[in-house]
């Protein structure tokens, strides 16, 4: 599989290493220096993986859609453009898989948090909350992962779930879901030890999206894998 990488910061470099380790090829690396040539450079690639910046997402989505190259969209801070991005992909009969977090562990954590919310919604006197912490270079707060957790939990607990963010040091990413009462407190925590899991998930999504048309969340990739491997 020939992969075009859009953005070559920390995540882009990790994805490049993961691509090569899997025996695939990095055919092109597109950064802000050559971003104007994106659509042209996409030619001959099987898939593109974008870990650039939120403000560049619409331009990148459109270039991939026009070039008929499936896109794994891993940038953060573009939720306000989500509806427009989906429209662009669908208008060009393109393909895109996106997600607030490409860690397989986080996507399983989503399901645990949602199931826990259903349980606590059935009893009284427990107050839900969400806490997240990341390195001080992360721009968006709350994180996309925290917002996704809140959306999932809100299905059972309503929209008013307090969500707190910390930006400090070199924290790869910690997300905590809590249920607090006068009698006790229950905490569910996901802690990323490195960004390697995000890169592995992005490559998994890249292999999955080939040959498909439409817009998908990474959660759908995980759902399909779970169904395929369930007894």
What are the roles of these predicted feature ranges?
Residues 26, 71-72, 95-96:
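Hydrophobic beta-strand scaffold residues
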Residues 2, 10-42, 124-231:
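C-terminal substrate-binding/catalytic lobe of Rossmann-fold NAD(P)-dependent oxidoreductases
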Residues 108-123, 141:
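Rossmann-like NAD(P)H-binding beta-loop-alpha module
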């Amino acid at each position: 599989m020939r992969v075009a990488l859009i953005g070559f910061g920390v995540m882009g470099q990790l994805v490049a290493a993961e691509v090569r380790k899997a025996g695939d090829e990095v055919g092109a690396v597109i950064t802000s220096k050559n971003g104007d040539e994106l659509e042209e450079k996409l030619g001959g690639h099987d898939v593109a993986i974008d870990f650039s910046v939120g403000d560049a997402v619409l331009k990148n989505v459109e270039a991939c859609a026009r070039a008929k190259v499936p896109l794994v969209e891993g940038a953060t801070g573009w939720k306000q453009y989500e509806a427009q991005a989906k429209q662009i992909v669908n208008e060009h009969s393109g393909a895109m898989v996106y997600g607030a977090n490409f860690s397989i562990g986080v996507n399983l954590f989503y399901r645990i948090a949602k199931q826990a919310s259903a349980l606590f919604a059935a009893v009284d006197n427990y107050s839900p909350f969400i806490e997240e912490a990341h390195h001080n270079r992360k721009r968006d707060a709350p994180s996309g992962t925290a917002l996704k957790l809140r959306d999932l939990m809100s299905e059972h607990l309503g929209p008013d779930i307090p969500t707190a963010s910390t930006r400090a040091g070199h924290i790869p990413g910690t997300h905590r879901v809590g249920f607090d009462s006068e009698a006790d407190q229950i905490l569910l925590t996901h802690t990323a030890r490195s960004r390697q899991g995000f890169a592995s998930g992005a490559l998994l999504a890249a292999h999955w999206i080939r040959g498909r048309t439409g817009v998908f969340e990474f959660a759908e990739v995980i759902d399909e894998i779970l169904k395929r491997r369930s007894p």
